[in-house]
Amino acid sequence: MSDFRRNCIEQKLLVGTFAAIPHPVAIEVTAAAGVDFLCIDWEHSQISRERIEDLIRAADVHRVPAMVRVPGHAAEDIAAVLDAGAAGVLVPRVSTAEQARAAVKATRY
């Protein structure tokens, strides 16, 4: 189990931030600032799917877990960010149990 996951399960206080600038240097600077995690905001920024992996790797350089807020409920977007190495996925606008089940199902492959 990753330290990030363990800390979340143990409900430890973590400090993180959202990142919407689609450049690896911006992610590296933010990660180097000492945050416990980053959330790359794919939903509200103009980031290509190809760039997501670069941003996750930039956070990895500083051993900072990077979650990604995906643009919607599409299973292929959820799978893509996990394939790219995201430490977690934030799925927006989940309003029903069925949507939650579908999002969880998309993480299992």
Regions found by a protein language model. Name each.
Residues 1-109:
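Expand to "…catalyze enediolate/carbanion chemistry for C-C bond making/breaking, isomerization
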